[in-house]
Regions:
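Residue-level signature of mid-helix packing/kink "hotspots" within the transmembrane helices
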Residues: 12-20, 106-107
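Cytoplasmic helix-loop-helix junction between adjacent transmembrane helices
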Residues: 62-100
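Helix-loop-helix hairpin linking two adjacent transmembrane segments in secondary transporters
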Residues: 97-144
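Juxtamembrane intracellular "pre-TM" segments in multi-pass secondary transporters
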Residues: 147-174
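Helix-to-loop junctions at the C-terminal end of transmembrane segments
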Residues: 18-30
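Helix-loop junctions at membrane interfaces in 12-TM secondary transporters
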Residues: 51-61
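C-terminal ends and interior cores of transmembrane alpha-helices
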Residues: 40-53
Length: 182
C-alpha cells in the first residue's frame, strides 16, 4: 500500500508538471492530436500496469506513463477543441454538459472500477480499462476539422509566452492554486 501511494503521488506530480507542456503542444499541433496521444499513452500505461511484473513496473506504468497520458484528454484541451466546433449560442450549454459529464463519469467510474477489480482481479481490470480508454480517441473524431484559431497579435515562441505569463500575477496565483489543489 505504501508503494502504491508513492506511485499515485508520482502520477499526480507528473500529471501536474506535464499539463503546461500538453497545453503548449496543443497550441502548436492542435488539441485533437494531444488528446488522442494522451489517451493512447494512458491506455498503454494501464495495460502495462495489468501485465506488470514488479513494483517498479507499476511506478513506470501508473506513475509515469499514466501521469503523462492524463495530461492529454483533460477538460482544458477538450473544452478548447469543443469550443472550436460548437456555435457561440450553444457553447455555454455544451461546456456545462462536458464539465458535468466528467463529474458524472467519476461518480460511476470509481464504483465501476471497484466492481471490475472484484470481478476480474486488479490485473485484468487494468487491461479492461486500457481497452476502454484506447477507444477514447474515437470520440475525438467528431472534433476533427475544427478550424485553427488565428491570433491578431504578434507570433510568440513558447518561451516568450511563458515569460509573459510568468510576469502576470493572476497567472502565477492561478498556477499555484492548481499546483496545490489539482
Amino acid at each position: 500500500r505504501q508503494f502504491f501511494g508513492l506511485v499515485m503521488a508520482a502520477q499526480a506530480l507528473i500529471y501536474g508538471i506535464s499539463q503546461p507542456i500538453a497545453g503548449l503542444l496543443a497550441d502548436r499541433y492542435g488539441s485533437i492530436r494531444v488528446i488522442i496521444a494522451g489517451a493512447l499513452l494512458y491506455a498503454i500505461g494501464l495495460y502495462w500496469a495489468g501485465i506488470s511484473g514488479d513494483s517498479w513496473d507499476l511506478m513506470m506504468s501508473l506513475g509515469v506513463v499514466v501521469g503523462l497520458g492524463l495530461s492529454g484528454p483533460t477538460q482544458v484541451l477538450v473544452l478548447g477543441a469543443v469550443g472550436k466546433v460548437v456555435p457561440n449560442e450553444r457553447r455555454s450549454m455544451v461546456f456545462g454538459t462536458v464539465i458535468a459529464s466528467t463529474s458524472l463519469g467519476m461518480f460511476f467510474f470509481v464504483p465501476g472500477g471497484q466492481q471490475l477489480v472484484e470481478a476480474l482481479g486488479w490485473r485484468d481490470a487494468f487491461i479492461f480499462l486500457a481497452v476502454l480508454i484506447a477507444l477514447l480517441p474515437l470520440i475525438a473524431i467528431g472534433l476533427r476539422g475544427a478550424p485553427a484559431i488565428e491570433s491578431d497579435g504578434p507570433k510568440q515562441s513558447i518561451w516568450e509566452a511563458i515569460l509573459e505569463a510568468r510576469g502576470h500575477s493572476g497567472y502565477v496565483l492561478l498556477t499555484l492554486g492548481f499546483f496545490v489543489c489539482g
